[in-house]
Amino acid sequence: MKKVIVYSQEGCSYCSELKNLLEQNGVPFTVTDIDEKKSDWEVISESSGVEYVPQVLMVDTNDESGRILAPDRDFDEVSECLQHIMTDLQE
């Protein structure tokens, strides 16, 4: 099983759009506010090489392996990010 964690920031329209798309498609996810969890955000942004949101961490709960989806690196549009998430969840 895979867990979806959205790294988000208040006032980010792209973050809101992604969360709405996930809800509309019935994808369970948790949100980590980067202003509240700065140390978590530092690890994610350093790992991805991208310092802005939204970013998504896909964690395989069976072996704790993970994949980060970052804007401009893995997707240009929020809908493209949703496609990556849906594909990952089916694997």
Enumerate the predicted regions with their spans.
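Local sequence-structure signature of Cys/Sec-based thiol-disulfide redox active-site neighborhoods
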Residues: 1-28
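Short beta->alpha junction loops/turns
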Residues: 11, 34-37, 74
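Noncatalytic linker/hinge segments flanking ATPase motor cores
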Residues: 14, 46-51, 71-78
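General small-molecule cofactor/ligand-binding pocket signal
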Residues: 30-32
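Thioredoxin-like thiol-disulfide oxidoreductase module
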Residues: 34-52, 62, 84-89
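Non-catalytic, surface beta->alpha helical segment in thiol-disulfide oxidoreductase systems
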Residues: 58-91
